[in-house]
């Protein structure tokens, strides 16, 4: 059986933490920022984690991560 391939788009966007969670960046912070408050923009700089319901899907996309 051939090797499984990682989804390259997902591999660039997610990193695994020491505890096994998947770390991700937040969306909506690249443009159209004038209408967003400073508090919102500050919170968008922080990272986030993949939810439990999405972890099974991510496991298929990233078998070696």
Curated annotation (Swiss-Prot):
| Protein name according to UniProt | Large ribosomal subunit protein bL35
UniProt keyword Ribonucleoprotein, yes or no: yes
Disordered, as annotated region: 1-25
Instruction: Please state which protein family the record places this protein in.
Output: Belongs to the bacterial ribosomal protein bL35 family.
Question: A Gene Ontology MF term for this entry?
Answer: structural constituent of ribosome
Q: Which Gene3D superfamilies match?
A: 4.10.410.60
Keyword annotations:
Ribonucleoprotein, Ribosomal protein
Q: Which HAMAP family match?
A: Ribosomal_bL35
Q: Which InterPro entries match?
A: Ribosomal_bL35 (IPR001706), Ribosomal_bL35-like (IPR021137), Ribosomal_bL35_CS (IPR018265), Ribosomal_bL35_sf (IPR037229)
What processes does the entry annotate via GO biological process terms? translation
Q: Quote the SUPFAM superfamilies the UniProt record gives.
A: L35p-like (SSF143034)
Residues making up the signal peptide according to the UniProt record: none
The organism's place on the tree of life at top rank:
Bacteria
Q: Does the keyword Ribosomal protein apply?
A: yes
Show the taxonomic lineage: Bacteria, Bacillati, Bacillota, Clostridia, Eubacteriales
Q: Which PROSITE patterns does UniProt cross-reference here?
A: RIBOSOMAL_L35 (PS00936)
Q: Name one GO cellular component term.
A: cytosolic large ribosomal subunit
